[in-house]
Amino acid sequence: MERENVVVEKRGGIGFLILNRPEVDNRLSQDFLTEISHTLDELNVDDEIRLIVIKGAGKNFCVGVDVAEILGLDEVAGRNFFVSLSEMYKTLHRVDKVTIAMVQGYATAAGMGVASSCDLVVASEDVQFGATGVRVGLFCMTASGVLLPRVVGSQKALELALTGDLIDGKEAERFGIVNMVVPRERLESAAVELAGKILSRNPVSIVMGKRNFYACAEMGFDEGLDYSAEMYGVLAATKGAKEGMRAFLEKRKLSYK
């Protein structure tokens, strides 16, 4: 598909999906949301890449939905807009490849949702996160109801959504919203370094492990253990897993790059 608001770059097995509306701080229009979803689907089946990094062009990662567009919508059109937002979150959550959000500046409202929907988050020291919908007369429904409770717990998620307060990188790291905080000039190198560690592992184990992780999160204790045992059996019988185990027993280095 032709892209207007998204740029894709491929380097060393990494697909960079760049949110490219810097003139409006990467605000998410409905067309933009659809474009992100389609691009994620394309990257998920692209054999050239094994991992996806999402970054925002300009000084801010993403400041949420395009409020000017929403203002002109009636109830039906507004619902359709937010269905597109939810579908983008679902697409981001279900891709087989590991996703890393590379976040700088403001990541607010749906922008915080994009980051929280990724598997891992690397942020710059100047980052500001917030479920800020309430500041403009809206409410971060998906962030407070679905995305953030999985990370920070229900009470903190609701507090953030009710107040619209901003939190900095260190506080976000303390709450588990981000995996690491680095100086802004090191942001991309830190994300690439983290990606490199993952890319050095058995690609089949990464895909199956991610799938197992999220599946078990939706299951009860016994069901999760049973499912994991089945997945483990399948994984251990694969060629890549057997080669990894042989290398370990033979005390030799192995790279899956």
Tell where the protein language model's regions lie, with residue ranges.
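Short, charged, surface-exposed hinge/linker loops at domain edges
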Residues: 210-219
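Charged catalytic carboxylate motif
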Residues: 31, 35, 84, 91, ...
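Crotonase-fold acyl-CoA enzyme core
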Residues: 90-204, 234-238, 243-246, 252
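Conserved CoA-thioester-binding segment of acyl-CoA-metabolizing enzymes
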Residues: 1-57, 90
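Glycine- (often His-adjacent) and acidic-residue-rich active-site loop
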Residues: 34, 45, 56-91, 107, ...
